[in-house]
Curated annotation (Swiss-Prot):
One of its GO terms (molecular function) is membrane insertase activity. GO terms for biological process: protein insertion into membrane; protein transport. The keyword Transmembrane helix applies. The gene is yidC. It comes from Laribacter hongkongensis (strain HLHK9). This is Membrane protein insertase YidC. Pfam families: 60KD_IMP, YidC_periplas. It is a multi-pass membrane protein. Interacts with the Sec translocase complex via SecD. Specifically interacts with transmembrane segments of nascent integral membrane proteins during membrane integration.
Length: 550
């Protein structure tokens, strides 16, 4: 791609990106308006539909239980059995990759926790404020274990015993949260289980101003598909999403990571299969917080009987391969924005290439080669058109000198020359137009994919999702853009010619702030373009010499 058209290409691309980010991308979230909530301790009675979830005030605290597996380190508070802290051990922190990334926390002015509980008409069942008892305060998944179980027991009330059981698994970000309800009384137990994610509306720490990825709650169902609801809409009492469903999931989504309560897993198991009703609920909560959860109306537990409900919680990176094995539609939380239809197959191909070379940087290089090969016929036609334009440059200059300031006659003579020489001045534009969606799709694929987060390439590139720390790739890209100017026809306008010399430097500075993976793509693309353009020019010169000699 010649420098002149590359500039047009980038301007158009970033024009589209600007329009998206300015008018369609999620904006910074305001604090919520005061929400109408039920007073603590007076939950709505269970009916034929799930009861309303209890109000959320300041988190109470008791004893902390630490659970460590090969992938996560969780802290469960015995007040309610909340997951108050969740560290992802194989994902580095933003400010220090050697430390684990903290997905859930209630420290440092942030709140992001997973809560659950049981509601009943007489408020006798344990909620997220009930004090539980545990056997130990620390659990570790041993090398010979594949699962780790943490059991919390609530004090029996009115002859009803309840246990809350967490099951952690090796090589998994799924945590199963089960309630065992054992009715020792002589009366039936009518209950609604609630599971929710509670967090503030702040952007994730370290969020880039270049990112503008979605942060907030989302719901997926087989009928409504993937539905995002912004914090701003929740604060205004708005929000369009499917509420009643016996499948899908409810989640809190942010850049690279997601937490989701799952009603129906990929193996077909559904939490709602034996329930009377299931209902998703997104709402603002007290204390400038937001709640994304699900209410499950349980069947009546008769006297002397027991009932169990098990809800999986996925809390981890938006890793495509992992999420695809957990629940239908969970991969949609990897937010490619409005170019999903292009970014998804591009990442699929990139992932396949990574499977061959086991390095995301080299996978990007191979992807660039394949994309270039796919566009080769269009590019070749473009370069042939540019080569002919370059050959006509001296005649163009003579026409300009001949007609001086009479631009109308100059344009007429120029078009006549193009017609005589069978040259299409717009012949090089089609490859640019075709590649614009590919460029934007790749931009979002690299931006949204956690697989490239903190992924190294070679030497000084330790994170393809961040800018080149030494600006070497942007400098090399500027050099290739300058080299391309010598292969292209010089502009007839002297001012435009000067601009073509300045623009490579200007755009290389702009690329200083782009992910190294994206700059790598364009650097390799430029090198391949130079090689292709040089080859086409040589072939045209050879054909011209042959025609002249004959």
């Amino acid at each position: 791609m010649d420098t002149k058209r590359l500039i047009v290409f980038i301007v158009l691309s970033f024009g589209l990106l600007f329009v998206w980010q300015e008018y369609f991308a999620p904006k910074p979230q305001p604090k919520p308006v005061a929400a109408a909530v039920q007073p603590d301790g007076t939950p709505a009675p269970a009916t034929a539909r799930p009861a309303d979830s209890p109000a959320t005030g300041k988190l109470t605290s008791a004893q902390t239980i630490t659970v460590t597996t090969d992938l996560v380190k969780a802290q469960i508070n015995t007040a309610g059995g909340d997951i108050r802290s969740l560290e992802l051990l194989t994902q580095g922190a933003i400010d220090n990759p050697d430390k684990p990334f903290m997905l859930m926390t209630e420290q440092g002015g942030r709140t992001y926790v997973a809560q659950s509980g049981l509601l009943s008409s007489d408020a006798s069942l344990p909620t997220h404020k009930t004090l539980y008892a545990a056997d130990k305060t620390a659990y570790t998944l041993l090398p010979d274990q594949n699962t780790l179980t943490v059991t919390l027991a609530a004090a029996p009330v009115n002859g009803v015993e309840v246990k809350k059981i967490f099951t952690f698994k090796r090589d998994s970000y799924v945590i199963d949260v089960r309630y065992d309800i054992i009715n020792h009384s002589d009366k039936p137990v009518d209950a609604t289980a609630y599971y929710r994610l509670l967090r503030d509306g702040k952007a994730p720490e370290g969020e880039s101003s270049m990112a503008h990825t979605f942060t907030g709650p989302a719901v997926y169902t087989e009928t409504g598909k993937f539905q995002k609801v912004s914090f701003e809409d929740l604060a205004k009492g708005k929000g369009d999403y499917v509420r009643q469903a016996d499948n899908g999931w409810v989640a809190m989504v942010q850049h690279y990571f997601v937490s989701a309560w799952i009603l129906k897993t990929n193996d077909g198991k559904s939490v709602c299969s034996s329930a009377e009703a299931c209902q998703f609920e997104l709402k603002p909560a007290a204390g400038d917080l937001y709640s994304a959860g699900v209410l499950v109306k349980l069947p009546v537990v008769a006297a002397g009987q027991q009932y169990s409900i098990d809800m999986p919680l996925y809390a981890g990176p938006e890793d495509t391969r992992r999420m695809a094995t957990v629940a239908p539609g969970l991969v949609l939380t990897k937010d490619y924005g409005w170019v999903t239809i292009i970014a998804t197959p591009l990442f699929w191909l990139l992932d396949k290439l990574y499977g061959l070379v086991h390095n995301w940087g080299w996978a990007i290089v191979l992807l660039t080669v394949l994309v270039k090969a796919a566009f080769y016929p269009l590019s070749a036609a473009s370069y042939r058109s540019m080569a002919k334009m370059k050959a006509l440059a001296p005649r163009m200059q003579r026409l300009k000198e001949q007609y001086g300031d009479d631009r109308q006659k100059f344009q007429q003579a120029t078009m006549e020359m193009y017609k005589t020489e069978k040259v299409n001045p717009l012949g090089g534009c089609l490859p640019i137009v075709v590649q614009i969606p590919v460029f934007i799709g790749l931009y979002w694929a690299l931006l949204a994919s956690v697989e490239l987060r903190q992924a190294p390439w070679i030497l000084w590139i330790h994170d393809l999702a961040k800018p080149d720390p030494y600006y070497i790739l942007p400098a090399l890209m500027a050099a290739t853009m300058y080299l391309q100017t010598f292969l292209n026809p010089p502009p007839a306008d002297p001012l435009q010619a000067k601009m073509m010399k300045i623009m490579p430097l200007a755009f290389s500075v702009m690329f200083f702030f782009f992910p190294a993976g994206l700059v790598l793509y364009w650097l390799v693309n430029n090198i391949l373009s130079i090689a292709q353009q040089w080859w086409v020019n040589k072939q045209i010169e050879k054909d011209a010499a042959k025609a002249k000699s004959s």
